[in-house]
């Protein structure tokens, strides 16, 4: 079987079974140990029987509902490879847009100042590690309630050479204890309403951690809790950045405006035209 034939089969088989037809490309890159460019340059190359067997097994497992990223053990985020397992949410492209928005606002708001930045809800460490690597002026902290998630993130920080301070705790509680004031708080909290959770794809619902996805009946529980805790840990001049669920922009904006009446609060749409981020800037 040639590379293009393997991809054609996988695309058709995945589509017939209601899965993303492009997943075959990710899997074949992993099996052949090449990047996408290498794959495209070798479309007419033969793959070995062993590679074909491995490839078809991965594809069948994905059709059964197992996320590709958990099978191959990583996801690419902001151009870097992050180890993932079922203790952490698989990083999404939308969160890369959150990173871009945060970095732009830090530069505009603070310039080259040394800052204390917290990512709340560590997961794989995608947000905290990326911020630490992209801007060396940031002292980055990250907090997660699940020690299992922290262990995954620590592994990623070590592999990628990022300096991040890890706290095991609930939301902003570690900073209440230490008295540390923060210049920037970033979070991609659980925001899926309980009812929507029931209708999610089995690929997500049966494998990714529910604690990282569901935010109460209306999906806004964690944002409400943030509003209670943020005023006690933020500097007067600060930035808050949230990823949100589709349709939650105005609700989260209202919550931030109530907590910080003088802040400039902005709902930002992602590349697909969906409200996906809310930023608050305090002078």
From Swiss-Prot:
User: Could you name the domain of life of the organism this protein comes from?
Assistant: Bacteria
Instruction: Cite the binding residues for substrate.
Output: 188-191
A Pfam family annotated for this chain is PrmC_N
Residues annotated as binding S-adenosyl-L-methionine: 121-125, 144, 188
Q: Does the keyword Transferase apply?
A: yes
Q: Which UniProt keywords apply?
A: Methyltransferase, S-adenosyl-L-methionine, Transferase
GO terms under biological process: methylation; translational termination
Molecular function (Gene Ontology), one example: protein-glutamine N-methyltransferase activity
Q: Which reaction does it catalyse?
A: L-glutaminyl-[peptide chain release factor] + S-adenosyl-L-methionine = N(5)-methyl-L-glutaminyl-[peptide chain release factor] + S-adenosyl-L-homocysteine + H(+)
- EC numbers, comma separated: 2.1.1.297
Keyword Oxidoreductase in annotation: no
Query: What InterPro entries does the record tag this protein with?
Result: DNA_methylase_N6_adenine_CS (IPR002052), HemK-like (IPR004556), N5-glutamine_MTase (IPR050320), PrmC_N (IPR040758), RF_methyltr_PrmC (IPR019874), SAM-dependent_MTases_sf (IPR029063), Small_mtfrase_dom (IPR007848)
Concerning CDD domains, the annotation shows: AdoMet_MTases
Query: What does the sequence similarity comment in the record state about its family?
Result: Belongs to the protein N5-glutamine methyltransferase family. PrmC subfamily.
- Tell me, in a sentence or two, what this protein's role is: Methylates the class 1 translation termination release factors RF1/PrfA and RF2/PrfB on the glutamine residue of the universally conserved GGQ motif.
| Protein name as it appears in the record | Release factor glutamine methyltransferase
Native source species: Bacillus cereus (strain ATCC 14579 / DSM 31 / CCUG 7414 / JCM 2152 / NBRC 15305 / NCIMB 9373 / NCTC 2599 / NRRL B-3711)
The root-end lineage is:
Bacteria, Bacillati, Bacillota, Bacilli, Bacillales
Name the gene behind this protein.
prmC
């Amino acid at each position: 079987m040639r590379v293009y034939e393997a991809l054609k089969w996988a695309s058709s088989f995945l589509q017939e079974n209601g899965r993303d037809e492009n997943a075959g490309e990710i899997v074949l890159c992993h099996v052949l140990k090449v990047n996408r460019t290498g794959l495209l340059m070798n479309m007419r190359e033969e793959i070995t029987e062993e590679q074909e067997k491995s490839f078809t097994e991965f594809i069948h497992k994905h059709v059964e509902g197992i996320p590709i990223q958990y099978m191959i053990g990583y996801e690419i985020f902001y151009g870097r490879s992050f180890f993932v397992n079922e203790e952490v949410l698989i990083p999404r492209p939308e969160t890369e847009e959150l990173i871009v928005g945060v970095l732009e606002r830090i530069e505009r708001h603070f310039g080259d100042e040394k800052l204390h930045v917290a990512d709340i809800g560590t997961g794989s460490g995608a947000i905290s590690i990326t911020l630490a690597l992209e801007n060396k002026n940031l002292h980055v902290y990250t907090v997660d309630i699940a020690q299992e998630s922290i262990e995954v993130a620590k592994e990623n920080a070590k592999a990628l050479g990022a300096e991040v301070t890890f706290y095991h705790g609930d939301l902003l509680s570690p900073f209440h204890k230490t008295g540390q004031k923060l210049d920037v708080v970033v979070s991609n909290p659980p925001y899926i309403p309980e009812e929507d959770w029931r209708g999610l794809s089995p690929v997500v619902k049966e494998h990714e951690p529910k604690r990282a996805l569901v935010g109460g009946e209306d999906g806004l529980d964690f944002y409400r809790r943030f509003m209670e805790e943020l005023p006690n840990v933020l500097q007067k001049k600060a930035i808050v950045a949230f990823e949100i669920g589709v349709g939650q922009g105005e609700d989260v904006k209202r919550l931030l405006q109530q907590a910080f009446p003088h802040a400039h609060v902005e709902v930002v749409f992602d590349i697909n035209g969906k409200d996906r981020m809310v930023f608050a800037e305090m002078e």
